[in-house]
Amino acid sequence: MSTSDSIVSSQTKQSSWRKSDTTWTLGLFGTAIGAGVLFFPIRAGFGGLIPILLMLVLAYPIAFYCHRALARLCLSGSNPSGNITETVEEHFGKTGGVVITFLYFFAICPLLWIYGVTITNTFMTFWENQLGFAPLNRGFVALFLLLLMAFVIWFGKDLMVKVMSYLVWPFIASLVLISLSLIPYWNSAVIDQVDLGSLSLTGHDGILITVWLGISIMVFSFNFSPIVSSFVVSKREEYEKDFGRDFTERKCSQIISRASMLMVAVVMFFAFSCLFTLSPANMAEAKAQNIPVLSYLANHFASMTGTKTTLAITLEYAASIIALVAIFKSFFGHYLGTLEGLNGLILKFGYKGDKTKVSLGKLNTISMIFIMGSTWVVAYANPNILDLIEAMGAPIIASLLCLLPMYAIRKAPSLAKYRGRLDNVFVTVIGLLTILNIVYKLF
């Protein structure tokens, strides 16, 4: 073998799938699997079997193409170590940097409000149905839970970051185990309700409207956009110098594809298992009760008549506890992102970007008061969680995940090679449909 052949062979070996690629695949997958997936089965199963089958077809393309578009935007910056804010500033100037800062903050903050409502409802449901205690005042419960989380965050943030990282895989394993454990309770109700003669494409409960609203919950549930920038920077630093940017882009796409497959497999299996255990009518009831599907499952098993099996009793309590842990995990993770974003906005507009004018402790205190105060108000008001996701959470995520990369591809010279592709049309349509949910909710 010649020297040149040895070099090529060595480079091929080094550029093949690495342990770090597996780590990032699992990291992207773990980031997406949080409390948001506990609402996906409700919206997906709301319209019955046919809409959820259509969502199954759309799930992987939405997850893969949208995140790949955002990764391509992050890859387009001249600095391999530059994050998404720096890349957007490079393409669109300081105004673009301000816009991306606002988008990141407003993409995460409404999620905290959603989780504030969810943790309150889940705890109250567990308190009343599983523990059998008298109902508590909603405002008191929300305040107590938020103060508890604020105390933990203030005095044990580093510990919580470690705990959250350890909780990711037990939570995913719990979802899979619950999905498998529900199989003995599957029934044919959702299949029996399929009447091809009475199916409607349009109308309030038509297939198209159900799938349209389902797209927004998929954008919300299949979302690991907060970690994409860090992921791309890591891969650029690892691969770009030796193998070039095109190779790095293909490697990132490969990792995103595998993470999306894992994510869709776990979430869709969980959704189908819930739907075959319950029914579309049960999903509608869960939406009306404003609780995640695990809490509804716990109440479902609690209300079973006759002698309960050990499995049914275990599912009754395990479902609620897993839901509570999942929401706590997601709340802490999104709180840290919201805190960082709000600190940046306060520093930029309140102190003209001068870090010497205010201490980090003061910034954290101001931000915490606003974040926890606004979350308590929303939790006390108890708006419908799915409506919040469809009208606020998902559209803002879509503007960041779908429309910003598509605009950059159209305007930025370094992204010109991606213009005119069919997948760009798909990503743009998904982004616009998700944002148009706001109009649908208003009218």
UniProtKB/Swiss-Prot annotation:
InterPro entries: Amino_acid_transport_2 (IPR018227), Hydroxy_aa_transpt (IPR004694), Thr/Ser_transpt_TdcC (IPR023726). Its main location: membrane. Keywords: Amino-acid transport, Cell inner membrane, Cell membrane, Membrane, Symport, Transmembrane, Transmembrane helix, Transport. One of its GO terms (molecular function) is threonine efflux transmembrane transporter activity. It catalyses: L-threonine(in) + H(+)(in) = L-threonine(out) + H(+)(out); L-serine(in) + H(+)(in) = L-serine(out) + H(+)(out). The chain crosses the membrane at residues 22-42, 44-64, 97-117, 140-160, 163-183, 207-227, 261-281, 312-332, 366-386, 389-409, 423-443. It is found in: Cell inner membrane. The keyword Cell inner membrane applies. GO terms for cellular component: plasma membrane. It comes from the Bacteria. It is a multi-pass membrane protein. The keyword Secreted does not apply. HAMAP family: Thr_Ser_transp_TdcC. Belongs to the amino acid/polyamine transporter 2 family. SdaC/TdcC subfamily. Involved in the import of threonine and serine into the cell, with the concomitant import of a proton (symport system). PANTHER family: SERINE TRANSPORTER, THREONINE_SERINE TRANSPORTER TDCC. This is Threonine/serine transporter TdcC. The gene is tdcC.
